Amino acid sequence: MISAERFLDEAFKLGFSTYTGVPCSFLKPLINASIESDKLSYIPAVNEGDAVGIAAGVYLGGGLPVVMFQNSGLGNAVNPFTSLIQTFEIPILMIATLRGDPNSHPDEPQHRLMGKITTQLLDLMEVSWSWFPEDEDDMKKTMELIKDRIIDSKKPHVLVMKKGSVEPYELSEQLESKFVNGLITNDYECDESEMVTRIEFMEKIIEKTNQNHDLIIATTGYSGRELYAASDRKNQFYMVGSMGCAIDIG
């Protein structure tokens, strides 16, 4: 086993400071340690696809993200991973636990099939993967691999975590819920007396936004195409596929 803090510290040295994901008992030590760390951020996600979208937003904002979830949710992540992460060549580190490991003790029945096909599914997705480190020697090799794959080659990589890889880590105190303050909203009024077309609405948004300060994310389909046709600016991101993940990127 390795300590959660040790892994997080080594990853932090490479630049990984934002973690997002969906809970799994295997991941509890990493999640708890990242929550309590003064230098790391943990963003909970409601599902695995949203976690991948959040990670994409972190990278586009200048950070290096780590996505963590149970392999049972890998299917939820396939769409944004193949259509967003790989299409836009976003280098994220993903940690997927191996519930239903066919070479370990029997797990709950719902994990049986995914446990058998997790690594095969990653191969089909054409993403590189390796086992999550279980000792110090593995740790060094893993960090070297992450540096080569993600930092230097700008490619995503997945660590598949087996049960018992990380030592337990309990929260030192119960955390209070935090509310986001200072949210800025703007109401854009349309002077037109009749309904406007989508591209006319896009033009209104472009007119009201500053490309040096505002980010415009267009979801997949005609929205992105018409935004591009109206005005192609450096603050505009045209998402393809990954239905539902535009809000996560933002």
Where are the regions that the model predicts?
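Thiamine diphosphate
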Residues: 1-152, 157-250
